[in-house]
Amino acid sequence: MDKIKIITDSTCDLSKEIIEKYDIDVMPMLINFGEESYLDGVEIKVDSMMERIEREDTLPTTAQIVPTRFIEKYKGYLEEGYKVISIHISSNMSGTYQSACLAKTELESDDIVVIDSRNVTVGLGLIILKAARLIESGITLEDLEKEILEYRNHIKSTIAFESLDNLVRGGRLSKGKALFVSALGIKLMLNVLDGEMNVQGKIRGTKKMVKAMIEQFDSIPKKEGEPIILVELENEDIYLPIKEYLENNNIEYLKLPLGCSVAIHSGPKVCALFYVEEY
């Protein structure tokens, strides 16, 4: 049986309890407020970060994990007799995956597998959880890679994106247009498709958004035994009805908070469902 260590990055948004249970090594991204840098989830938490963004009306940036950090991490585990599976945020959203690939190339080791999750937040988290369960079953690194490359293709998501504040702060949207959209009560429904954020629809009103999310969730057959994850940041108007729906229908789910790295780009008032389609 291979002795395998899972390495990921802090965009996976898994809870401390899950990380400790499966002994997952989560490498923090850097959150930069000007010249000040903080390790995501270690030196700064999402609540304090959002408060600072609001107070200072400034948007921090994120920095990818550099190859030297991966080299150091991989070498340490290889020396301890581990094989490594390193699974990261979509390469379309960050250069972290490329950094991990450069580190593997530098070390010239067949005992390191690097995977582009093509996902983010708990979509990446679902893949990490799958890898952890497979490792517990005694899988080899070679077979684990095959399983995860297939599994990642079946992660589905339904995301309510209400606030345009961070798009304005980041210069991606004019304040005037944001005010116009907000005044109309328009909310965006998105998903992660082929490693990128994809706008599925523009929906007017909270009740219609909840209805659309539930309808889409119901329309996709789920793979039995795989987790359903509900993730939320400052959006109880959508989170609570979704939670009530799941509980009334005896649908088991995990509730996890959105982390710093993702919240910088999404802004507040986000709620999403991530799950695995039948395959």
From Swiss-Prot:
It holds the Pfam family DegV. The keyword Disulfide bond does not apply. Hexadecanoate binds at residues 62, 94. Keywords: Lipid-binding. Residues 4-277 form the DegV domain. GO terms for molecular function: lipid binding. The keyword Nucleotide-binding does not apply. May bind long-chain fatty acids, such as palmitate, and may play a role in lipid transport or fatty acid metabolism. This is DegV domain-containing protein CPE1310.
